[in-house]
C-alpha cells in the first residue's frame, strides 16, 4: 500500500510518537514496537482518527520520558498500516512514511504528545541533469562496493535504485537502508534541497566505504597470519613424521619446544634472548648424540634458569631491622649504625647504587652473620660465597665453553641458586684470595664490586652481559692488609672488634647456652651455668676474639651432662668454677698474673693479637760485657729495631738519665719477652722497652700496677699505636688500672665501653720524660739512683674517664 503525498491531506494537528535510535524517511515501510504508555496512547488516537501519526527521533535515546526539548522538530508524517497488541503489553505497528513535516508547536504534552505540523515541501532541483546523473551513479557505485565488501544490505536495493531517477528519493532510500548514525540520518532528513541531500549521502557513503576497506585489509592480514601459522604447523607436523621415520621420535621435538618456551619466558634482554635462540637453532640441527649438543644444551639450561628480570621486593622497616640486628648480634654498635644508615637511604631511594660494605675483624665475631641479618631485614634472598683458597680467575668470571666441563663463575652460580637478580651475596674471606699462573681472581672481583661497571658483567661461560647492579654485595675479611689496594678502594671498611670477656659472658648467657642445650637434647632442668663457671670457661679454655671455640666448649659441657643424664648418674649439674675442670679437664690456657711488686728492669707492656689484647711482660738483665744488646723471645724486625732505638736513646741521654758513665763499657744487656714460642712484632712496645732498659741501667724499679703501650722515636717522642681498646681491656682483666698511652690515642678511648673506662686511670704521654715520671717507683726500697726527669707528669693529661 502506498500513498501519494500530493493528494493526501495532512491535518493541522497530529498525535506524535517519539522514536529511539532510528530516523523514519518518507516512503519507508518499517515495523515499530511501541511500549511506553504515552506512545501507545498516541497510536490509539491516530487509529481512532485518520491513522496518520507524526514520527520524530529523540536526541537522547536513554531518556524514558522525553520532553519537547529532547525531540527533533523535523520528522515524518506516517500512516499506520497495521497494528497488533502483544502479550507483554506492547504494541507492534507497521508504518509507511508519507511526507516530511516540521513541528510548529506542541498542542498537548500529557498524557500523550500532540503537535501542530507543517508539511516541508521539496525544493526544486537546481543542478543540471548531467550533474545529478553523476551524483546518482556515484551513489550506486558506493552501494555496490559496500555490498561487495560484505555489508548486509539487500541486493534488491540496486534494482529499486535503477527504477528511481529523483535525487531526493534516491538519497532518502539509501539513508533509510544503510543504517547510519541517527545524527547523520537526521541531517539528511532536514536537508530540503534534493541535490545537496544526495551529496551529503555520498559523503556518508564514502566514509563508510573507507572504514569497510580498512576492516577488509585487517581481516585479510589476519587471515594471512593464520595461514602462515597453519602452514608452519603443518610443516612441523610433517617434520615430526619424518623424524619418526628416521627413528628420532617426538621426544626431542617436545624437548626443544619446552626449552624454547623457557627461554622466551625467562625475561631476558632482547640481545640476550636473540643469542639464546640462535644457540637453540644450532642445537635443533645437531644430532642428539653429538658431543657438542650436550654442551649447548647445558648452556641453554643455564640461560633459562638465571633470574634475568626476577626480583624480590624490598620490605624495609627500620624499627624491625633494628630489632633483627639486636636480636642476632650483641654490641657492634658502629656496624649496626652504618647498616641502619644504608637501609634508610635504600628505603628513600630504592634505585640507589649502594656502597660495597666490607666487615673486617678477627674470626668468630659475627661478620658473616651480619650479612645474613641484612638480608633478613630487607626481605631478600641470602647467599654466601666462600673465597678462601680461590686462586683461579675462572672461579669468578667463569670458564669459556670450549673447555670440557666448563661452568659459569661463582657469581652467576650464586644468582641461579638464589633465583632472584637482587639477593644479598656475602663474599666471605675476601682477604684469602690467591693468585697463580691461572690468573688473579682479585682482579676479576674489581668488575664485580664496581657499581659503575657491574651492570654489564660478562661471564666467560655465558658470553653475554648480566646486570649485577641490583645485587647487594657484602665482603668479610680477617686481615685487611692482605686485600689488594685497588680492590680495597672499592669497599667501605667497617672494623668489627673482638669481644671482651664481659661481652662473651653476656652472649653466652643469652645465646650460646640455649642453642647448645637444645642441640644436645637436654633441658634447662638438667644444667645451670653460673657466671663464675662461664668466666672460668672463657679464661681457661678459650683464647680468641670471637665465639666459635667458646661455643664448642659450651657444647662439650652440654654433651658431658647429656651423657651423665642418659646413664642416670645425675639429673642436674651446676656448671661453676669447680665443676668445669671436672667436666673438661685442666685449663688449657694459664693467664699470667700481674707482677706482685715493683722490680728493676721488669715492665708490663700491652700487645694486640687477633685474639684480642695481651699483657706482655718485658724483662731486662745486665751482665758483664762490652755494651752489647741481646734480644730473645722470637721478636720480629720491627720490635728489634724498637729495642735498638731504645738502647740508642739511653746512650744519648746517659748523663741526664743518671746512667753510670762506665755502664756500656762494663755490661751487656739482654732483653727477653716470655712465651718465646709465639712470634711477636710491631712498634707498640717502644716505650716499654725503653722503660725496661732505663730501669735496668739506673737501678730504678718500675711500678707493678702500671702497664704501657706506644711507639718511641730517637728524640724520645711517644707516637700513637693501634688496638687501644683491646689492650686496655686486657690490662683491666689482670687488675691493672693505670695505663700509659700516647697522647695521640686519646680519640681511641671513645671505643672503650663506659663501664670499663670508669675503672681505668689513663695517663696520656707525649714524650719519654712523662712516661718515666709516672712509671718509676720512687718509693721502692733498694733504689740506688733515680733518673732525672725534666718534667713532672702532666696531671691534666691523666684521665680518670
UniProtKB/Swiss-Prot annotation:
This is Lon protease 2. Keywords: ATP-binding, Cytoplasm, Hydrolase, Nucleotide-binding, Protease, Serine protease, Stress response. CDD domains: RecA-like_Lon. Its EC number is 3.4.21.53. Residues 14-209 form the Lon N-terminal domain. PROSITE patterns: LON_N, LON_PROTEOLYTIC, LON_SER. The keyword Membrane does not apply. Residues 597-778 form the Lon proteolytic domain. Belongs to the peptidase S16 family. Pfam families: AAA, Lon_C, Lon_lid, LON_substr_bdg.
Amino acid at each position: 500500500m502506498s500513498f501519494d503525498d500530493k493528494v493526501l491531506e495532512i491535518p493541522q494537528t497530529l498525535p506524535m510518537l517519539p522514536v529511539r535510535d532510528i530516523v523514519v524517511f518518507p516512503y519507508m515501510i518499517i515495523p515499530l514496537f511501541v511500549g511506553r504508555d504515552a506512545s501507545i496512547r498516541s497510536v490509539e488516537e491516530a487509529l481512532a482518527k485518520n491513522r496518520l501519526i507524526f514520527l520524530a527521533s529523540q536526541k537522547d535515546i536513554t531518556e524514558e520520558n522525553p520532553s519537547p526539548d529532547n525531540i527533533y522538530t523535523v520528522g515524518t508524517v506516517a500512516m499506520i498500516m497495521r497494528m497488533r497488541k502483544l502479550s507483554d503489553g506492547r504494541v507492534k505497528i507497521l508504518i509507511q512514511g508519507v511526507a516530511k513535516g516540521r513541528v510548529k508547536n506542541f498542542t498537548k504534552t500529557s498524557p500523550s504528545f500532540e503537535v501542530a505540523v507543517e508539511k516541508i515541501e521539496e525544493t526544486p532541483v537546481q543542478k543540471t541533469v548531467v550533474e545529478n546523473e553523476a551524483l546518482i551513479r556515484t551513489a550506486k557505485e558506493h552501494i555496490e562496493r559496500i555490498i561487495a565488501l560484505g555489508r548486509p544490505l539487500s541486493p534488491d536495493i540496486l534494482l529499486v535504485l535503477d527504477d528511481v531517477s529523483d535525487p531526493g528519493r534516491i538519497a532518502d532510500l539509501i539513508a533509510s537502508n544503510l543504517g547510519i548514525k541517527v545524527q547523520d540520518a537526521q541531517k539528511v532528513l532536514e536537508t530540503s534541497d534534493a541535490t545537496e541531500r544526495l551529496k551529503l549521502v555520498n559523503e556518508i557513503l564514502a566514509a563508510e566505504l573507507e572504514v569497510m576497506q580498512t576492516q577488509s585489509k585487517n581481516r585479510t592480514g589476519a587471515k594471512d597470519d593464520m595461514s602462515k601459522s597453519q602452514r608452519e604447523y603443518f610443516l612441523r607436523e610433517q617434520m615430526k613424521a619424518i623424524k619418526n621415520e628416521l627413528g628420532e621420535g617426538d621426544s626431542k621435538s617436545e624437548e626443544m619446544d619446552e626449552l624454547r618456551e623457557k627461554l622466551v619466558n625467562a625475561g631476558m634482554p632482547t640481545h640476550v634472548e636473540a643469542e639464546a635462540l640462535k644457540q637453540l637453532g644450532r642445537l635443533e640441527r645437531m644430532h642428539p648424540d653429538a658431543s657438542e649438543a650436550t654442551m649447548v644444551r647445558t648452556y641453554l639450561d643455564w640461560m633459562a634458569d638465571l633470574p634475568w628480570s626476577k626480583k624480590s621486593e624490598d620490605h624495609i622497616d627500620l624499627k624491625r631491622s633494628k630489632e633483627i640486628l639486636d636480636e642476632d648480634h650483641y654490641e657492634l654498635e658502629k656496624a649496626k649504625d652504618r647498616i641502619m644508615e644504608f637501609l634508610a637511604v635504600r628505603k628513600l631511594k630504592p634505585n640507589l647504587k649502594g656502597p660495597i660494605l666490607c666487615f673486617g675483624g678477627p674470626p668468630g665475631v659475627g661478620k658473616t652473620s651480619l650479612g645474613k641479618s641484612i638480608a633478613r631485614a630487607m626481605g631478600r634472598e641470602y647467599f654466601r660465597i666462600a673465597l678462601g683458597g680461590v686462586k683461579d680467575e675462572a672461579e669468578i668470571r667463569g670458564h669459556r665453553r670450549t673447555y670440557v666441563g666448563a661452568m659459569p663463575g661463582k657469581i652467576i652460580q650464586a644468582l641461579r641458586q638464589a633465583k632472584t637478580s637482587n639477593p644479598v651475596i656475602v663474599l666471605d674471606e675476601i682477604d684469602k684470595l690467591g693468585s697463580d699462573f691461572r690468573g688473579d681472581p682479585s682482579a676479576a672481583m674489581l668488575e664485580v664490586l664496581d657499581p659503575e661497571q657491574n651492570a654489564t658483567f660478562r661471564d666467560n661461560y655465558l658470553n653475554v652481559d648480566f646486570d649485577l647492579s641490583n645485587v647487594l654485595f657484602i665482603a668479610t675479611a680477617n686481615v685487611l692488609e692482605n686485600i689488594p689496594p685497588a680492590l680495597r678502594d672499592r669497599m667501605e671498611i667497617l672494623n668489627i672488634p673482638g669481644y671482651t670477656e664481659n661481652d662473651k659472658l653476656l652472649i653466652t648467657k643469652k645465646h650460646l647456652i640455649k642453642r647448645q642445650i637444645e642441640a644436645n637434647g637436654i633441658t634447662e632442668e638438667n644444667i645451670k651455668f653460673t657466671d663464675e663457671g662461664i668466666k672460668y670457661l672463657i679464661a681457661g679454655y678459650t683464647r680468641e676474639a670471637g665465639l666459635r671455640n667458646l661455643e664448642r666448649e659450651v657444647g662439650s659441657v652440654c654433651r658431658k651432662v647429656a651423657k651423665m643424664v642418659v646413664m642416670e648418674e645425675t639429673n642436674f649439674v651446676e656448671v661453676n668454677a669447680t665443676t668445669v675442670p671436672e667436666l673438661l679437664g685442666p685449663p688449657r690456657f694459664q693467664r699470667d698474673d700481674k707482677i706482685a711488686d715493683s722490680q728493676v728492669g721488669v715492665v708490663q707492656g700491652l700487645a694486640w693479637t687477633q685474639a684480642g689484647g695481651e699483657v706482655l711482660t718485658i724483662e731486662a738483665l745486665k751482665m758483664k760485657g762490652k755494651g752489647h744488646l741481646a734480644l730473645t723471645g722470637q721478636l720480629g724486625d720491627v720490635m728489634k729495631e724498637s729495642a735498638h732505638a731504645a738502647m740508642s736513646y739511653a746512650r744519648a741521654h746517659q748523663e741526664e738519665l743518671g746512667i753510670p758513665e762506665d755502664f756500656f763499657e762494663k755490661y751487656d744487656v739482654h732483653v727477653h719477652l716470655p712465651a718465646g714460642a709465639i712470634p711477636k712484632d710491631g712498634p707498640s712496645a717502644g716505650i716499654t722497652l725503653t722503660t725496661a732498659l732505663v730501669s735496668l741501667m739506673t737501678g730504678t724499679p718500675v711500678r707493678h700496677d702500671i702497664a704501657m703501650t706506644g711507639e718511641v722515636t730517637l728524640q724520645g717522642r711517644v707516637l700513637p699505636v693501634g688496638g687501644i681498646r683491646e689492650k686496655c681491656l686486657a690490662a683491666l682483666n689482670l687488675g691493672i688500672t693505670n695505663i700509659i698511652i700516647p697522647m695521640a690515642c686519646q680519640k681511641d678511648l671513645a671505643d672503650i665501653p663506659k663501664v670499663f673506662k670508669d675503672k681505668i686511670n689513663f695517663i696520656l704521654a707525649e714524650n719519654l720524660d712523662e712516661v718515666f715520671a709516672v712509671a718509676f717507683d720512687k718509693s721502692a726500697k733498694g733504689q740506688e739512683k733515680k733518673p732525672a726527669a725534666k718534667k713532672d707528669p702532666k696531671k691534666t693529661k691523666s684521665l680518670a674517664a
